[in-house]
């Protein structure tokens, strides 16, 4: 990992399998209204975040684009991720959807374009992956990847297209630490990107988490984010509160001990707070 430049110099980056880079911490805007998303992204950029994560299905790409434009930060210092909605899957439709996302964002390219969900139709997501390969070739996206893909899904697209995703974004927190899938990702040199790192807030008052937080003089959220970073993940948190947004970026001035990591790893019980990708067909 290396440090990025400018205001966000303290944020390390990870190199993807296509030699592009991503900051290891980003802000997400899922389930935020337009006004909330715009305020959240503005606050995040001001705090020093440079990785912004949205999706067509969130319905707030235009708001994200407005916040980016208003920030005055050079485009090449910001990393923008958006995602292909399940109804838009398909070889041709995925390319059209990517261009529509660019238009809503008001950008010439995105840094990362992801298939949002497998969606339950193998042939459809394989065709979509072919579309994303064209999206990358055409310069619409610098890097391409997937969200919520299991080991079999990854094997399918890699074996059929001979092109490996740069990123697999998955639900990941101490109750669902995804050790097996992280190992599969690593075997393909795919970066694991963690969403839902705070367990939709339910882990913030977990006794094991709060005890570690007290030991370090940190917030529970900072401990949860730090745990994920130390596992080697890129981590995407979400908040509409500017103070929490700034606090959640302050995760590089301390390190969890091996025992603390083991304690948090030991909380894994398979609990999901988001849909199970193996059966989910929504967007």
UniProtKB/Swiss-Prot annotation:
Q: What is its EC number?
A: 1.1.1.-
Residues that bind NADPH? 196, 198, 200, 236, 238-240, 244, 247-248, 274
Task: Give the InterPro entries listed for this entry.
Answer: AKR, Aldo/ket_reductase_CS, NADP_OxRdtase_dom, NADP_OxRdtase_dom_sf
The source's domain of life comes to Bacteria
| Activity regulation behaviour | Inhibited by the antituberculosis drug isoniazid (INH).
Q: What are the record keywords, sorted?
A: NADP, Oxidoreductase
For this UniProt entry, the molecular function terms from Gene Ontology, in alphabetical order, are: aldo-keto reductase (NADPH) activity
The yes or no answer to whether the keyword Signal is present is no
Q: Where is the active site?
A: 58
- Answer yes or no on keyword Ion transport: no
Q: What the protein does?
A: Catalyzes the NADPH-dependent reduction of dicarbonyls. Exhibits narrow substrate specificity, with preferential activity against the dicarbonyl substrates phenylglyoxal and methylglyoxal. Exhibits weak activity with ethyl-2-methyl acetoacetate. Cannot use NADH. May play an important role in the detoxification of methylglyoxal.
Q: Which family does it belong to?
A: Belongs to the aldo/keto reductase family.
Partners and quaternary state?
Monomer.
The protein, known as: Aldo-keto reductase MSMEG_2407/MSMEI_2346
Q: Which organism is it from?
A: Mycolicibacterium smegmatis (strain ATCC 700084 / mc(2)155) (Mycobacterium smegmatis)
């Amino acid at each position: 990992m290396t440090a990025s430049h400018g205001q966000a110099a303290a944020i390390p980056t990870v190199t993807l399998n296509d030699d592009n880079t991503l900051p290891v911490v980003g802000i997400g805007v899922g389930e935020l209204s337009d006004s909330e998303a715009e305020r959240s992204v503005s606050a995040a950029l001001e705090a020093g975040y440079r990785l912004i994560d949205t999706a067509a299905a969130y319905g707030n790409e235009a708001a994200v684009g407005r916040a980016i434009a208003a920030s005055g930060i050079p485009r090449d210092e910001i990393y923008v991720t958006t995602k292909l909605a399940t109804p838009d899957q398909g070889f041709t439709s995925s390319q059209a959807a990517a261009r529509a996302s660019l238009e809503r964002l008001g950008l010439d390219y995105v840094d990362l374009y992801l298939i949002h969900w497998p969606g339950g139709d193998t042939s459809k997501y394989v065709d979509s992956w072919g579309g994303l390969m064209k999206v990358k070739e055409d310069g619409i996206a610098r890097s391409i990847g997937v969200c919520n893909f299991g080991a079999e899904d990854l094997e399918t697209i890699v074996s059929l297209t001979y092109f490996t995703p740069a990123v697999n974004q998955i639900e990941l927190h101490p109750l669902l630490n995804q050790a097996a899938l992280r190992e599969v990702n690593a075997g393909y040199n795919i970066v694991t990107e963690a969403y839902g790192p705070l367990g939709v807030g339910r882990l913030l008052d977990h006794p094991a988490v709060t005890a570690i937080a007290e030991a370090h003089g940190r917030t529970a959220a900072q401990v949860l984010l730090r745990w994920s970073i130390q596992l080697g993940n890129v981590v995407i948190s979400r908040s509409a509160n500017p103070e929490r947004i700034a606090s959640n970026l302050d995760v590089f001035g301390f390190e969890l001990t091996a025992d603390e990591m083991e304690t948090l790893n030991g909380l894994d019980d398979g609990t999901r707070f988001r849909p199970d990708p193996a059966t989910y067909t929504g967007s």
